[in-house]
Amino acid sequence: IREAQGKGLIDKAPSFTSTFRYLENSDLTPILKALIEQSASPLQSVEANFAADSSGFATSVYDRWFDHKYGKMRSEAKWIKAHVMCGVTTNIVTSAEVTATETADAPQLPALLERTTQRFDVREVLADKAYSSIRNLHIIDAVGAKPYIPFKSNATGNGHGHKVDGLWNYMLAYYNFNRGEFLTHYHKRSNVESTFSMIKAKFGASVRAKTPVAQINEVLCKILCHNIC
């Protein structure tokens, strides 16, 4: 910023704390999400297969508690979790959500997929077992895409205690009896892990912000920078 001021590109260099003050504004969150989605748009003609996953970012805020067993205070850094959907060809993030670390992955998939389908023709959705549910299978099928989500070891034809579901049973049979073909598609899911590795390698695996809103916005900024860099 000081360099930009020296070159006459801006009249006044703002305080280095200005960015952190803006990050604390909750109105910035939907704007950052929209920018992430818009920045992915130029790759509409390239991406058709998408992977979903989540990853944690460490904060500088700590939980502290007294350990009665050992008679001393203990502390542990709090984490926040980024949920993303990305194209498996270019690693572009097409939608993102940031939540508390204990938030489950499966309920995040519908919104990630819905926002991705606003700009992309989705043909395949890849995700790990954490996303396995009847609801997610039907949501993916409803947009004309095929789900490649492995089943948990205790999965049965009755859909985890629910009434018999045709799509669940079809995909379970496909997974069990066409495992090789399933895996040729599913292996592309590893690209979402590569996406998180790229983001953390370039922009850091932790956040400096102290407040929850600012932490969410800081992670969204990392994802946005990944898309445009």
Segments the model singles out, each with a brief description of its role:
Residues 198-229:
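Charge-patterned, long linear interaction tracts outside catalytic cores
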Residues 108, 191, 195, 220:
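Catalytic-loop motifs flanking and including active-site residues across diverse enzymes
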Residues 12, 16-144, 223:
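Polybasic low-complexity intrinsically disordered regions
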Residues 130, 134-201:
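Helix-centered, glycine/charged polyanion-binding patches within enzymatic domains
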